[in-house]
Amino acid sequence: MTKFPKETNMEGLKELALSLLYLDIQKTKFSPMVVSHPFTNNGITAQIVNGEVKTLNIFENKDDLNTWRKGMEDIINKTDKPYSLYFLINKPYALVFVKFAMPYLSQKDFSSLLSDAWTRTEMPSNDSNFKPSEFIKLFKSADKRFLMETDELQQYEELPDTVTVYRGVKSDRPNKVLQLSWTLDPDKAEWFAKRFDEDGVVYEATIDKKNILALFSRRDESEIIVDLDYLRDLTEYEIPSEDMSQVQ
């Protein structure tokens, strides 16, 4: 059982953020315009310096990088709420930030931030920084009252004791079926299977409600987060022929 502080430790969060700020800027194939870093994906950015807007090339110019970091330090040190600090984080790094911020967060704040980070991230199950078991541990540590929005929690509470779930994967990646993210909607699973105009496969399985870690409907995906150890009756779902005829 994870032990959370009663109140979020903002000083601890700020120290974490400052350590992330000084990580190296990572090159991408679109650099110098696009980079990878916990606080930005822009290699060319603008910042107010001495009352004037200045263009900074933080990828190629060390002085510009130092200027940008000093400005970000000031912003970080002035934040007084966990959400204000969290929203400074570059979206691809949101889940990693929540993972390392966990020791400083109250359970309420942790649950809320985990929920937002998961639903903001494109294909979070594929994040190479996490094993499925790590995600399961994070979700099990969360309080469902703050992990889900009010309507989502109500939908979760109304689920039957045993639930049928679906997942769409590319036909050449059947191993990807063993992930946390499933859906209640077979049509949505089919969409994910076909989203890149490739042949895909939809799987169905059953799971007891007590082993469902979260339900997220905010992206219109009827997403179900499951504890993989308790999935059963995994089979390939036969897509109805009338649906297949609509796939171009």
Model-found features: residue ranges?
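Conserved NAD+-utilizing ADP-ribose enzyme module
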Residues: 1-164, 171-180, 186-248
